[in-house]
Each structure stands twice: as C-alpha cells, then as structure tokens.
Amino acid sequence: MSVDRVSLAVSPLEGIKSPTFLSIKAGDFVIIQATQQVAHQVNNDWWNSIMSTPDRSTELLVIAERVVAMAKPGEQVEAYVSRGGETAVRVYEGEVEHFVSAQSEGIGIRVIKDGRTGFAYAGTLDADAIAEVLADARDNVAFGTPDEYAGLAEPDGVAQIPQKFWDDELAAYATADKISLTKELEKLTLGMDSRVRVEESNYDDGWGEVAVATTTGIRESGRGNSCYVSVSTLADDGDETQTGFSFSVGDSPKEFNLPKAAREAADRATRLLGAVKPPSKRTTVVLDPYVTSQFLGVLSSTLNGENVSKGRSFFADKLGETVADPRITLVDDPTNPLAYTATDIDGEGLAARRNVLIENGVLKMFVQSSYSARRTGTKSTGNATRGGFAGTPGVGCLAMQLQPGTQSQEELIKGVDDGVWIQMVQGLHSGVNPISGDFSTGASGMMIRNGAVAEPVREFTIASTLQRMLLDIVAIGGDIDWLPSRAVGLTLVIRDVTMSGQ
C-alpha cells in the first residue's frame, strides 16, 4: 500500500518518549512503530478530529467539477478525487508491537481525445498541483495508443440503492479503545487452550471520501468507513507447531464477535497437531468457508468480461450453457449491506447493482466496465474497479456470493462417508490456470470417515479443474461467513477431487 500525503501527530502520553509531528511528501508511507517496552497508549485526538468530521465528499465533488469544466472542445475529461485514512494496531504479548495512523488525499485525471488516453495524478489537492495534473494528462494523450474503444462511462439510468456506509460510532472510536480491544482478542485466544500461543492480534480500520465527475455527465460523491480484527495462532505439542487464524468484521467494533474469532483461531491450530501425510486418492472434499472464499476469488477473474474478450477465461463462448451443478447460483452483489465490500457506485461512478452470474448452474453473464462493454458490444454492469486516485479503472467482481443452502457445516460433514475437510490452502492463486481451469494447491485439514472428523492431515495437494469442480458440487452450506474480502465464505462439498499425499 502507498500513502500519497500524510499528516500525523502523536502526543507524548505514557510510553511515548516525545511528541512527533510529521508532514510527509507525496509517495512516502508513515509507520509509527512502538516496541513492547515503550508502547502503552497513543493519543487519538488528532485522528478522531479527522474521523468524526461531517461528510466532506461534496467538497471533493466541487474540485472534480471544476476540473471537468476546464475541458477543451473534442476532449472527454474525468476527475477522480479521494481522501482517506487508516489505523492499524498489532499487539504481541499484551503490548503494542506496531501502530500505524495515516491519511492520504489526491486526484487522478483522465483526458481522452481522438481515441487516445492521457492520465496523470498527484497526491495533493493543492490548486496549482491540480492544474499541473490536468496539463500533464493532456500532454500524455500524445503518447497514448489509439484505441477505438477508449471513452468514459455515461449515465445509464440505473438508480443507486441507498446504503449506509458511514458509522459514526466507528468514526469516534478512541485509539486507546482500539488498542484495548486488540489486547482483549489476544487474551481471549490465549485462554482457549494452554497449547496455543498468539503470533499476532490485529485491529484495522479505514475511512474514505471520494468524488468523480466527467464531461459525459457523471457526478457522484460519498464516504464510508469499515473495520475488522484478526488473530494468528501457533499451537505447540512437543517439537511440533501448527498455525491458525480467524477474523471478525463489522460496521463498528461493537459488532465484533471476539470470542468466536478467538475460538476459531485456536481450534484451527490445535486441530492440526499430530497431522500426517494422507494417502493419495480421489475423494470428496469439504471446503471451509475461508477456503471457499479464496476459490471464488480465483473464479472471479474468469467471469471478467475483459479477460473473456481477450481469451483469458475458460468461460469464453459458454454463455447460456450449464457450467455448474443446478444447486449453484452465484451473484455479485455489492448492494448487499452485509458484504464487507458493499458500495453504491463502481469505479466509474455508475450505480452498483446485483448481477446474477450463474443461475441454477447456467452461465448468465460476465461483469463489465464501460470499456470492456464497448469491446464486447454489451453494456456496463457497474463493475468498474479502481485502486484509488493513482490508477485508471479496471473491471472485476465487487462482492461475490453463492446462494446459501440450509445445512450447517457439522451436518454437511455428517453426510460424507469418506473425505477430507480442507481447512487451509497454500498458493491457490499461483496454482490456477484461468484459461484451462486446471488447479493444484497445497492443503491441510482433517480426514472424514463415516460422517465424523478423524485424524489431521497436511503436506498434500488437491487438484482438479475449476470447470469440473463447479459441476461436482454436491452440497452448499448455510454458514455464511462475512470475510474482509470481495467474496463471501460458506462450506462447500465437492466430490471426486484428486488428493495427492504419500
């Protein structure tokens, strides 16, 4: 992550040796790191003064509109303006090991003329700098590659679905409370099992304001904030050590379920103690919700309209065909307020919307930005993605979710005579070929025999193709897990997967 403009102030309270005031040039990233010996409390007055201010995204929209108003004849101009910040706390052995408090702001400007695109950005909202960015974007048009599909998004008449993205309680949450909460998560986790150590306990939150305006008529602005906690564990038994982890997310810290996160992190590690390498065979796998989320993340690239148009997806030419078990309905729904990545607009300012990608096993659509839609002769699905003011729009899924079933994970496991419960995978993204669909990934978990969890296993791989996996799904859990990612987790049962061990 890069932070383009940062202003920080830390007051000299207990454990902080002296006050520090920093004004950082563009491109720098500020970390305040406190050792176990000195870090006890951080003054949150400065941070809360930013986090609790009224919505200033309309100020950003005024800036964007002023830029767009300077468009010359024959130009399309887009101004994307944002401001945001984050807090990150890491606790180890009851003390603050790492603390980050940072803010950034900036503007990115696209200019399109005669099929060529120029782009420039700056990590400041200084008026002179903005004028320079616009001039640079115009100059960069000359270096752009001619593209018949180049252009900005235009209003498409799809109405936004009102959502609440800003939580005042989170905005006012004191830094000292964030630290106390992180320490409490560590304490709870340590109390779950005497064999468990906590590698790190973390609290993370962020806030952002954004505005986008274009010469094509888009005018949008808004703000949001979010938070989550995570904990990583180590379980020891003699010379053996196994790892675990867990998350909890919420609109505000009061929604965290710390006992659940602590229990899951401890169980993930202790369950694997004594794990052996399993025999190789074809078997049924039960994917833990976190693993399902990872697979959906990989699958999302194959449903990307731009990748499809470039021949980078095995779903090319499959629209209208059965590509999954009839139980499968897969949606991309950033309008669901429970999704961690919920939003009301995409990266181009179009309304976010619920898109049904696969319905009852049939491939219905691909996600599109305005650019990929022009390439494929379709319409934008409100799926433009953007990494911030320093980047131009891409395309991708925003909040994927499988339509859940009704059974719990325990009930699904009871229905498996012989299989393996996959608790963790390693190297999944690098182990998948999105064109052929082939995948092979390292895994660890628990064997299942006669519907009961048996011995732990590790150092094996599972392999199949994504196409085959979608068709071989035999059960879907109702245990939705809202993770801090673009894909929601739940338990999946898949037959006939190759497990390679000894």
Name each region found by the language model:
Residues 18-502:
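N-terminal small-residue-enriched
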